[in-house]
């Protein structure tokens, strides 16, 4: 199956992960959460999906799902405004596909506290000037860091500025 080429065992976490596009990209939070349904759930790989959700839950920091895990095994990077929101989507899809009492317990015990942490961090403001405004929309960065999927930057020049509420 083609999905096999995107799933890999990450030695540093001891669990499965999604590779966004080797050799250029390893595991990226946004890409992983978007692809989780097609690569694991629709193919019946429920344990792989659970492992991936667990890995990203372990690394949530200041309410932010990692943007990427560097190849070198160093600390994850967190410069993304939307990976945490895609995480909610992936958890919902996981329950849609599995739905057993055991799966609900897993989410209740392992994932739900992290979802609450994400909401609280966005409400109060987190790293990279990411926060929820009074209207409920997300403010995505100050312009100093590129925190959306359109993140091209060459020196001080930003090809597609997307800060604020783009």
Where are these regions (language model features)?
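Acidic, mature catalytic/reactive cores of soluble proteins
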Residues: 1-166
């Amino acid at each position: 199956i083609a999905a096999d080429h995107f799933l890999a065992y990450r030695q540093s976490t001891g669990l499965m992960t999604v590779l966004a596009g080797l050799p250029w990209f390893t595991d990226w939070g946004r890409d992983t959460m978007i692809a989780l349904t097609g690569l694991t759930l629709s193919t019946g790989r429920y344990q792989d999906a659970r492992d991936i959700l667990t890995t990203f839950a372990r690394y949530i920091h200041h309410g932010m799902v990692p943007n990427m895990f560097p190849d070198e095994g160093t600390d994850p990077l967190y410069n993304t405004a939307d990976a945490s929101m895609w995480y909610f989507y992936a958890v919902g899809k996981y329950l849609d596909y599995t739905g057993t009492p055991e799966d609900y317990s897993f989410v209740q015990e392992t994932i739900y506290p992290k979802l609450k942490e994400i909401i609280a961090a966005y409400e109060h403001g987190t790293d990279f000037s990411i926060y929820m405004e009074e209207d409920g929309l997300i403010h995505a960065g100050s312009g100093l860091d590129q925190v959306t999927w359109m993140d091209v930057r060459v020196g001080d020049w930003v090809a597609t500025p997307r800060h604020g509420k783009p």
